[in-house]
């Protein structure tokens, strides 16, 4: 376990220093050490995916993650890889499904915003950015983003199919405004 921890830390440091060949060498050793422990092997596989993503190899990242159970780390890495490969919109449904049961996951809201932007859906992207701020409990920033969405609709920057999204933005803006008023009253 100690050797695995040391190899993991050394690999992560090499990735951060952008020494990808050294990281791959360390990762191969880590894979050997963790082979008999499924949980540790999963962590090594996730680190391998992170390495390839950092090295600019999104397709290799997706290959490493293929067949992995749909847990949050895999979802985040797959989305980042698809965004890097300009295929972010492929992950929209999976991200929305995750957020239906984990609405306070700011990272996933930000990834959803990026997929919407890549798919030329600015109003949805602004709403997702606002929801990320709500998840961070930064209601002031969230209200700013919701207002930006309302302004986008007023300026005609939203498509006709965005009517439902505009309604959601209006409702969420009112809810966030109410929270801000409550917080101000408590002070």
Language model: regions and residue ranges:
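Extracytoplasmic and endomembrane cell-envelope/extracellular-matrix remodeling and assembly machinery
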Residues: 1-64, 70, 155, 171-174, ...
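Alpha-helical junction/boundary sensor with strong preference for TPR arrays
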Residues: 34, 69-72, 102, 136-137, ...
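TPR alpha-solenoid repeat register
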Residues: 6, 40-44, 74-78, 108, ...
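Residue at a conserved register position within TPR or TPR-like alpha-solenoid repeats
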Residues: 14, 52, 82-84, 116, ...
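Alpha-helical adaptor scaffolds
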Residues: 46-56, 62-120
């Amino acid at each position: 376990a100690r050797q695995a921890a040391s190899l993991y830390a050394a690999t992560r440091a090499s990735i951060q220093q952008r020494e990808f060949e050294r990281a791959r060498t360390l990762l191969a050793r880590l894979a050997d050490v963790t082979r008999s422990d499924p949980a540790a092997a999963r962590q090594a596989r996730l680190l391998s995916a992170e390495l390839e993503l950092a090295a600019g190899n999104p397709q290799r990242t997706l290959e490493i993650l293929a067949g992995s159970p749909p847990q949050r780390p895999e979802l985040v890495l797959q989305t980042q890889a698809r965004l890097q490969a300009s295929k972010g919109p492929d992950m929209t449904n999976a991200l929305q499904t995750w957020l239906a049961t984990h609405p306070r996951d700011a990272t996933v809201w930000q990834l959803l915003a990026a997929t919407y932007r890549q798919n030329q859906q600015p109003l949805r992207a602004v709403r997702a950015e606002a929801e990320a701020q709500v998840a961070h409990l930064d209601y002031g920033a969230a209200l700013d983003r919701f207002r930006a969405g309302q302004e986008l609709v007023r300026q005609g920057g939203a498509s006709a199919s965005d009517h439902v999204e505009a309604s959601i933005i209006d409702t969420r803006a009112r809810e966030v405004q109410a929270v801000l008023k409550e917080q101000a009253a408590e002070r």
